[in-house]
């Protein structure tokens, strides 16, 4: 006699979801891939609430602070990230004398110790996120924690230059 023909976990063989680009007769346009609802945030991302304006910059400068508590190992990672992404223009010590400045490829990169700039953690993070003047955004190259690591490293360089 034959044994009953059971399927173990049948939903693995017959998925409940639709293939992303398959035809779907539920919607009028017959597409399964839908545009996300307005206001949704992709998993793994966080909302950055400051706009790319002078007012947003000033607000970030006053209000924004690092949400992460950093440990000693983070300092080494921060230095590495700074060297790769920032040091070429801003220099190893943050004095605005990176290799591109020395070779006159980019001019006018200010020192972190310039008293007229009065940078804060919030303003530094905002500039890394959006860019400012001739500096482009690094939001695609650095994730949120890495941006904060670089921000803290910049603030350390600023304090070292101010001594």
Question: For the regions a protein language model found, what residue spans apply to each?
Answer:
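Periplasmic c-type cytochrome electron-transfer domains
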Residues: 1-70, 142-151
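Short basic alpha-helical hairpin corresponding to helix-turn-helix/winged-helix-like nucleic-acid-binding
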Residues: 51-80, 93-96, 105-107
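Conserved beta-strand positions that form and line the central face of beta-propeller blades
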Residues: 11, 67, 111, 134-137
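Gly/Gly-Pro-rich "capping" loops immediately C-terminal to redox-active cysteine motifs
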Residues: 9-15, 75, 79, 91, ...
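Glycine-centered loop/turn positions within well-structured domains
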Residues: 84, 96, 133
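The canonical Cys-X-X-Cys-His
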Residues: 78-93, 150-154
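C-terminal capping alpha-helices of c-type cytochrome domains
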Residues: 122-134, 139-163
């Amino acid at each position: 006699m034959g044994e009953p023909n059971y399927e173990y976990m049948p939903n693995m063989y017959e998925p409940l979801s639709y293939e992303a680009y398959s035809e779907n007769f539920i919607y009028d346009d017959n597409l399964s891939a839908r545009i996300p609802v307005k206001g949704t945030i992709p998993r793994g991302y966080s909302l950055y609430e400051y706009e790319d304006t002078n007012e947003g910059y000033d607000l970030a400068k006053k209000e924004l602070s690092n949400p992460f508590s950093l440990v000693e190992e983070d300092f080494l990672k921060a230095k590495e990230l700074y060297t790769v992404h920032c040091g070429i223009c801003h220099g190893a010590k943050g004095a605005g004398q990176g290799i591109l400045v020395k070779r006159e490829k980019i001019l006018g990169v200010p020192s972190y110790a310039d008293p007229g700039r009065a940078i804060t953690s919030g303003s530094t993070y905002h500039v890394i996120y959006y860019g400012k003047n001739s500096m482009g955004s690094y939001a695609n190259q650095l994730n949120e924690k890495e941006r904060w690591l670089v921000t803290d490293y910049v603030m350390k360089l600023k304090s070292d230059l101010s001594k």
